[in-house]
Amino acid sequence: RDARMSGCDHPGLLPMEAALERLLALAEATPVEQVEQVALAEADGRVLAEPLIAALDLPPWANSAMDGYALRLADWSGQALPISQRIQAGAAPTPLQPGTCARIFTGAPLPEGADTVEMQENVELDEAGRVHFREPLKVGQNVRAQGQETRIGECVLPVGARLGPIELGLAASLGAARLAVRRRLRVAVLSTGDELVEPGQALGPGQIYNSNRRLLIAWLQRLGCSVVDAGILPDDLQRTREALGALGEVDLILSTGGVSVGEADFLGMALREAGELALWKLAIKPGKPLTFGHYQGVPVIGLPGNPASTLVTFGLLARPYMLRRLGVQRVEPLGFMVPAGFAWSCCLPNHHLARRKQLGSYHR
């Protein structure tokens, strides 16, 4: 629900929809424009930079949808028909002889002159090898017409389409060996906090294992990003400045932790020094604090340090921002009307997301 329409305002809290709108506008102002030609085998997860236009009809010729017998319906008036040829997938049939039928298999091209296929379960063969059709027939039954799925010249995938198994299979069916895609988004990932320790190391007093960076790197790789692992930053302003300054070649710096208004908010301090910081308190739980700014011209998104908050804000806000920079238009998270599983109160943030272990999934 939009806080502007809910009658339950939260002063100082930005509705998630408004935050997403701002992020998408910022993304559109700095699109990734470089284009690469990549082989289909390397295109999974990439974003199409040029429309995919059908270079042939699909199917390229009329073919049988069933194992059965192909005939010209005008030749049949209830009599048995002799078999004049046998057609398998990949064969080049000859024109159908008048008054005959052809044994045909699924996917095989229909012979010239045939317009109907009867499935093999509905026929009988007599001792002479002639075919008896036991049921009424209709012109075009069990036939996949040429161009039934796609016509030559049609745009089958638009600019900005994300390429996955279905899209790549479609491109292959049209004979495309390479596709024009946006270059990968270069994203640096860092975590902040003296309390963080890498998995496998011994924990000291007050320390926790760093899970957020591994979560984000895995998700970014699935999005097709080129990831720079910038490690863990201690709570030190000078070290933060140095780390951010060394990442000038990336398209985005994605950090977790250090986005509060406390004394240890060294990421925010560094961005304030650069003069480009927006600290948004979102009407969402988990995930209230979110930082967006620039450091020496490089966009920076600061996510909360709590793992649940990191997961939610990345999925709802950072991920759409990155996809929009690559030209993807449909980036908004899908919404579903489902039971909330908790009592609504005006003291709650505008979006309250319950954990999976409580409700089986995240609910809005």
Regions of interest found by a model, annotated:
Residues 23, 68, 153, 189, ...:
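Residue-level signal for inorganic ion chemistry
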Residues 24-31, 51, 73, 110, ...:
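Structural signal for hydrophobic packing residues in well-ordered secondary-structure cores
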